[in-house]
């Protein structure tokens, strides 16, 4: 009797973390971003970053090589100048602590216009692991791809390294190194280095970037200071530029535990030179930003503002032109959380379009309405006012998200954007899990000039003997920019994977498959991608 009681009691103790983990939401809405926690999902271990991103309502798949064309990919808020398609398909969800889908981070991150950020925070293993992978893409054009990836974690040091090479009408080389050093419980240093080299028939370009992020925690209440320093050099056949930057940011509770404040200053100094004319220009940006969040058990209120000071100078034939402008981003948001499953958001966001410096200083012919900036001789902003309503329901095996936004654009066309997504998984929990994942979503864009939509469906089956079969299908209605660009109304990709023991994985993707059967396709991109991966 006592023995049975002890066994039952031990089982309950071991089960508590599992119950607590499954009770936490997979998706968490914040004022300026949506957080996804893969570790709270039921994972087989083979899910990729791209699989998890299927639950994002505003995800726009533009093709096999451009699945997140409207996002800037970062790791720990450092831009990742790598082969995006490889990173999305190779990075495993089990190695990710959280995904930050940042659609309105104009205050916190200084994004401009409709710019969005996809920020990944890694979950490091307690030992060294990684893989070496080779790929061949066989279609109208043949491509060879090689990649190596390594993760290492310990009590004091974490290391992430990724390198890839692609040969297809030229050569592309990428290298990313990211290291975290924890000196003690209150001091941490993140260092980051990335390099890319692109050798194409049109010319050669390269980019090198280094960044250091130092965190110091002052007290047990969580008052934290962040200091960032970085430098970037980029060069292509037309231009070369240097970009040093700095950030100083303080995050702290204020007066009560419910009220928190983010206060920061940020600056960068871009120095650009036009090679054929020897014309050069300097752009100095200095920002001040402040954001308050008041959190109650079921309510969160956030207000914030970032003021940007622009100083830019053109130097040409001994003549110097100087200009100065001020911009600001703002947000105001309320989030209601009635229980651990449901979340509702209502927010207002003020952002702006800033015409690029290139047409302003180079007198370049552009494909957008930024041409008008040339005649004015200075940057003139266009304000964007966005109202957003969002809802999320999430638990371990099911997430549902909906979003509705209205954009009022100064001197532009106002439009409405609607998005919805569903992610559902049913698994048989064994040593070799089998089951099914169903993911889908839709996006609708409507304005006076027209309306278009996209619908996507992405099922994945986990079969016995470690087989995995997945499919991505996206349908684009008339007037969709994607459909008008390619001439094809449907994008499709069929994937088959087979795991051989713990070390080897063989996969085949038949991508852009509908290009082969649609006569209106402007470019036939359908191909078979074959890859072999060795894990260590």
PLM features: what roles do these ranges have?
Residues 135-140, 154, 165-169, 193-199, ...:
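Transmembrane beta-strands of outer-membrane beta-barrel pores
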Residues 207, 322-323, 340-342, 352-406, ...:
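Outer-membrane beta-barrel signature, preferentially recognizing the C-terminal barrel domain
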Residues 333, 390, 522-536:
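Outer-membrane beta-barrel "beta-signal"
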Residues 399-474:
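Gram-negative outer-membrane beta-barrel transporters
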Residues 80-104:
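Short acidic/polar hinge/loop motifs at secondary-structure boundaries
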